[in-house]
A protein has these predicted regions:
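Membrane-interface interhelical connector segments
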Residues: 45-65
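Extended, low-polarity transmembrane helix blocks
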Residues: 1-45, 64-72, 76-79, 83-169
Length: 169
């Protein structure tokens, strides 16, 4: 007869792992923040006019205005999420950018973001990406909005400072 180790049946829900739970937002913040900043930076470095032309081609109204709005949301919102500042405030416009990308660009290509079409001497050849990564970013933003930014964040430091001030009173 096999005995079950009670510690294993509880998994990570034991007190010794509880101290690690507070760190769960950190990788979400870092990848979402960095990802958004990287996309915004790429649009700037490759010439915003190319992005505006794409927006015009897919029928986005006021493509230059919407292009700059997108770039600013990606750069500023990405940085805010990366450092854990005003995450709830920036999550809404960031989610809007993702939803627009899903419905105007990625939806016709299905879910998968990686579509291997061929492997040639030049390397792997991929098709257009689907909406998978956008949905992952939305899930990460939702987790951060519903939870908190974590201890290594501007919001975490402000909360810690505020609680110390209250204790001193």
């Amino acid at each position: 007869m096999m005995t079950i180790n009670s510690d294993r049946t509880q998994g990570i829900n034991t007190p010794r792992f509880a101290r690690f739970f507070r760190w769960t937002p950190l990788p979400l913040r870092l990848i979402v923040g960095y990802g958004f900043m990287a996309h915004g930076y790429a649009k700037v470095i490759h010439g915003p006019e190319h992005f505006f032309a794409i927006l015009h081609a897919i029928g986005v109204p006021a493509p230059e205005l919407m292009g700059w709005a997108t770039i600013l949301v990606e750069l500023i919102g990405g940085f805010a999420v990366f450092i854990g500042a005003y995450v709830r405030l920036f999550s809404l416009p960031m989610a809007a950018v993702l939803l627009v990308a899903i419905f105007t660009v990625h939806l016709p290509y299905g879910f998968s973001s990686i579509k291997l079409q061929a492997v040639t001497a030049a390397g792997a050849q991929f098709g257009p990406p689907g909406y998978e990564v956008d949905v992952l970013y939305l899930a990460c933003l939702a987790s951060l909005v519903l939870g908190w930014s974590g201890p290594l964040s501007v919001e975490g430091l402000l909360a810690k400072s505020s609680s110390k001030e209250k204790m001193a009173e």
